[in-house]
Amino acid sequence: MKRLVSKIDKSVNFVNTTLGTECRYVRRNDKYISAYLSSHNGCKMACKFCWLTATNQTNFRHVSIEEYANQLDTVLSHGKEIDGENSRIVRVNINLMSRGEALANKNLVNNYDKFHKELQYIINKYDYSEMKMNVSTIMPKVVEHKKLIDIFGDRPVNIYYSLYSTNESFRKKWIPNSMRYEIALRKLREFQKETDNTIAFHFAVIEDENDNLSDVQSMAEIIRSMNFSKTKFNLVRFNPHPSMSNYKEPSVEKLEKIYEILQSVCNDETIKTNRSRIVPRIGQDVLASCGMFVDNDL
């Protein structure tokens, strides 16, 4: 196990060189820990913005429920060293946002109840106050035949949909293995009606690719038309792999304009915490920021 500690913000990237997974400890404030867990050892979803795609790390071994729990144990063992008895007032955000695609992990999809119980056990083991489950997904084609309620049941979960764009040419180029956005949005709306869960849209903005303001406005109107009861938008930062030097994030001014357009259709006034935002980068020096992963040879 390699332990990469950020000199920027004390984020820690735990790299299991035997299993090929990464789990991350991130602390944005004292109130909660963000534990980023891997769902696979690589990824074959072929998302163009992802470092796994750029470095051809396409092995797709499904992380077991035990491995998920072990990853969380690793992160919280580190967290407990810092928090001590104060852990009782600290929330743990479990973010399935590291390696792989959570909704393509057969162990999670077929036995979410057991998965949830095992991770809750680890939370209790370290005496943390509560667990919040956040699942990032491109809504892959492999679960197009499934209802989200059949996967998650009545267990609490927050879906973070990596929509990126409703422009089909962009989607074919950048997220080729995602289901059509129309299908994904219907599934998410149906899931929200059944659970009253917040639906979050989170994605990066890439200059000259998905930053056209007219396209963003169109995407916003499509989302508005779905009548989601509780939504939020997180614009995460684009961190292109060095081999993608011809792509970059637009200016901060452009990013803020895009955020304003999206926020105009957002119903997050009903959300008491963790509102829409432009998400700051974390742990870049240990490859812990969005879309970044260690190379095969580390």
UniProtKB/Swiss-Prot annotation:
UniProt xrefs under Gene3D superfamilies: Aldolase class I
Domain Radical SAM core span(s) in chain numbering: 29-272
Alphabetical UniProt keywords: 4Fe-4S, Iron, Iron-sulfur, Metal-binding, S-adenosyl-L-methionine
GO terms for MF: 4 iron, 4 sulfur cluster binding; catalytic activity; metal ion binding
List ligand-binding residues for [4Fe-4S] cluster. C43, C47, C50
Q: What does this protein need as cofactor?
A: [4Fe-4S] cluster
| Cofactor binding: number and manner | Binds 1 [4Fe-4S] cluster. The cluster is coordinated with 3 cysteines and an exchangeable S-adenosyl-L-methionine.
- GO BP term, example: rRNA base methylation
Q: Which domain of life is it from?
A: Viruses
- Name this polypeptide is given: Uncharacterized protein R756
The species is: Acanthamoeba polyphaga mimivirus (APMV)
